[in-house]
From Swiss-Prot:
Keywords: Ribonucleoprotein, Ribosomal protein. NCBIfam families: L17. GO terms for molecular function: structural constituent of ribosome. It comes from Clostridioides difficile (strain 630). One of its GO terms (cellular component) is cytosolic large ribosomal subunit. One of its GO terms (biological process) is translation. InterPro entries: Ribosomal_bL17, Ribosomal_bL17_CS, Ribosomal_bL17_sf. Belongs to the bacterial ribosomal protein bL17 family. Part of the 50S ribosomal subunit. Contacts protein L32. HAMAP family: Ribosomal_bL17 (MF_01368). This is Large ribosomal subunit protein bL17.
């Protein structure tokens, strides 16, 4: 059984796509994507927020290695981490919004709680 979804992409493309999705989610707080991409984005976004809650230098460097925008990382450590200090996981919510018009792919919003 696979530990992650392959999303029909090669490894490098999939990892870069997920890094972009996580960066956009942390920047804007809400993005629209397919349900399967949202589920994979949730895994990594929750890991980044948990690292930010630790707040030490090593955690910041680990997040900087994954998130593509330094201002997003600063926002994550200064604003979002204190907001979720009392919450043990479950930082995101996926809301299904129905099929996409072009190819009927199941779409969803993923947002920070």
């Amino acid at each position: 059984m696979a530990k992650y979804r392959k999303l029909g992409r090669e490894t490098a493309h999939r990892n870069l796509m997920l890094r972009n999705l996580v960066t956009c989610l942390l920047r804007s707080g809400r993005i629209e994507t397919t349900v399967t991409r949202a589920k994979e984005t949730r895994r990594m976004a929750e890991k980044m927020i948990t690292l930010a809650k630790r707040g030490d230098l090593h955690a910041r460097r680990q997040v900087l290695a994954y998130v593509m925008d330094e201002t997003v990382v600063n926002n994550l450590f200064t604003d979002l981490a204190p907001k979720y200090a009392e919450r043990n996981g479950g930082y995101t919510r996926i809301i299904k919004i129905g099929p996409r018009k072009g190819d009927a792919a199941e779409m969803a919003f993923i947002e920070l709680v």
